[in-house]
Amino acid sequence: MTDSLEYNDINAEVRGVLSSGRLKLTDQNIIFKNNKTGKVEQISVDDIDLINSQKFVGTWGLRVFTKSGALHRFTGFRDSEHEKLGKFIKDAYSQEMVEKEMCVKGWNWGTARFMGSVLSFDKDSKTIFEVPLSHVSQCVTGKNEVTLEYHQNDDAPVGLLEMRFHIPAVESADDDPVEKFHQNVMSKASVISASGESIAIFREIQILTPRGRYDIKIFSTFFQLHGKTFDYKIPMDSVLRLFMLPHKDSRQMFFVLSLDPPIKQGQTRYHYLVLLFAPDEETTIELPFSEAELRDKYEGKLEKELSGPVYEVMGKVMKVLIGRKITGPGNFIGHSGTAAVGCSFKAAAGYLYPLERGFIYIHKPPLHIRFEEISSVNFARSGGSTRSFDFEVTLKNGTVHIFSSIEKEEYAKLFDFITQKKLHVSNMGKDKSGYKDVDFGDSDNENEPDAYLARLKAEAREKEEEDDDGDDSDEESTDEDFKPNENESDVAEEYDSNVEDDSDDDSDASGGGGDGGTDGSTKKKHKEKKNEKKEKTHKEKEKIKKPTKKKDTGKPKRGTSAFMLWLNDTRESIKRENPGIKVTEIAKKGGEMWKELKDKSKWEEAANKDKIRYQEEMRNYKSGAGGGSEDEKGGTSKATKKRKSEPSPSKKANTSGSGFKSKEYISDDESTSDDQEKVKEIPKKKNKSTAEDKDKNSKKSESEGGDSDDASNASEDDDEEEDEGSD
């Protein structure tokens, strides 16, 4: 026989919610540990009264009855594990794992049976449903009915609020069945009532969350917080953990209670109660128990009279009544000589306490992180000149908690603690000591060179130099391209009477200044390349544009399908049968009806006839009866469009008188869009004439202006004839 069985993915029922966790069965105990809260529940072998198996949706589970009447249900077992688990229970616990039969008829009348702390509603000896009475918060009786109210679980998306039982009156019965039912429920229900004498009362205790001063009354099964505005009744079994932590200045003490389920104040939930005490405040209380009760009920852990600091007295009473040990700060001692590490979490400052099995942050908001929840931790630097760092904790569920503004002096102690607990550090390389020594080894020596900061400065310097170079080049390019009076100078050269003055200015500007001659030539080359690129892109865009095809109205209409013929015929009937139907949904509805239609021969014959009609008309259309084919029409239209879109440049020159320029006035940087073609035809040698050649040409133009005009017109006529011949 195996010593134990362990299952990592088992769900336990907790107030209507299946909480995941780990289940371990040994020959001494059945242990379940909740993954979310870390709460551990143990069932001793001596306390087990009955073990059954029960079928659930898609799986099966265990029902464990204890001798005290409590019912524990665990689900999530595979079918293959049934035989193995049954054999282990028989050998280890001497129990037969019998299957529990359930009634699935759906009836709402039957017999109510009380078995321990469970109300079972049966029909024909089969259980319809079960109600753990520990989930009942209140029981109210009526004339012939009983109403049960239940505790709510915040993790449950849907919860049962109340249930009513109708109990018919029986004349022969001596006892009232309604009253008897009520007594059976209340004897096992978890009803919080402040009746009876309280065990201890602590007055005006300062609580940080929820904020205020409260009187704390402790009863045997719950404790009550009574404030000026709010009152809370908290069951003892809802307390998960107790923490007693000293303040960093050692002048105050924190007493923290972890709650599940949390208490509510409006829409705010408080998972932790944080009580604040002064160490010098003392109190003396006397418990209302006899010596025999203290010895038998509490095993001598409490004395009849308790005295000392308030936090010690309250902690001792809570520890015994709740049955949980108080967790202290552990062995960690920070740079300040205390267990608290000052830091900021979210928007508030507080203290981080490294514990033996986790971290706890106090106080706004309080947070407890167990080591088994942590995936990795990370030490993040806040900057080379700052004297603090950030501590990042990444959980296995992906959540990241960042504790910032921690003093660098705390790094060595915190790092040693983490390595001792064997937590994974995400930003640690192979050389752990190197990171420790370089980043935080000597926090006082701020004059050591920072390689990271130096690299950032170098990159910023390079970027500034690149930006300066880019600005210079941009300024040069804008100066070259910017010509506000370019169009005005063109008009002046064409139509002004004093043309020689403008040309002389241009020649003086081009020829003057011997130092800038080389710069001017390079600029002209740069402009020529730009103009050539612009002309190429303009021509390419013209080539890309394609004429749109016009729809041929004479082309025959395609044949209609059988479905469309049927839909056109039944469209009105669909609208009548479905008033308010959308236009887009008519086709969808018709498709469903078409699939269900069995006899489609009528519409298929009509579709075939329409198809034959289309083929005949298309044959006549292509042969020429219905007009030319679409391709032929498209071809002719393309040809005509091409001729229209490509007029000869000579015609354009003749029609516009402003487009003419004599050769001596044409320069590469003063060409308009109309005479770009002419600029290309002029040889470059003539464009690179010196100032002397320009003077000679200007004198010749005065005397031979008429001859040059005739010659240019003749050359243009020759060019026009050549273009027409090429077309």
From Swiss-Prot:
Family of the protein in this entry: Belongs to the SSRP1 family.
GO cellular component: FACT complex; nucleolus
Compositional bias segments (type: Gly residues): 510-519
Compartments, record wording: Nucleus; Chromosome; Nucleus, Nucleolus
Taxonomic lineage from the root: Eukaryota, Metazoa, Ecdysozoa, Arthropoda, Hexapoda
Keywords: Chromosome, DNA damage, DNA repair, DNA replication, DNA-binding, Nucleus, RNA-binding, Transcription, Transcription regulation
Keyword DNA-binding: yes
Species: Drosophila pseudoobscura pseudoobscura (Fruit fly)
Biased composition (Acidic residues): 464-479, 487-508, 704-727
Quaternary assembly: Component of the FACT complex, a stable heterodimer of dre4/spt16 and Ssrp.
Protein's name in the database: FACT complex subunit Ssrp1
One GO MF term: RNA binding
Matches recorded under InterPro entries: HMG_box_dom, HMG_box_dom_sf, PH-like_dom_sf, RTT106/SPT16-like_middle_dom, RTT106/SSRP1_HistChap/FACT, SSRP1-like_PH1, SSRP1/POB3, SSRP1/POB3_N
Residue stretches of biased makeup (Basic and acidic residues): 529-555, 596-620, 675-703
Biological process according to GO: DNA repair; DNA replication; regulation of chromatin organization
Function: Component of the FACT complex, a general chromatin factor that acts to reorganize nucleosomes. The FACT complex is involved in multiple processes that require DNA as a template such as mRNA elongation, DNA replication and DNA repair. During transcription elongation the FACT complex acts as a histone chaperone that both destabilizes and restores nucleosomal structure.
The entry's DNA-binding region: 556-622
Origin superkingdom: Eukaryota
Disordered, as annotated region: 458-565, 596-727
Keyword hit for Nuclease: no
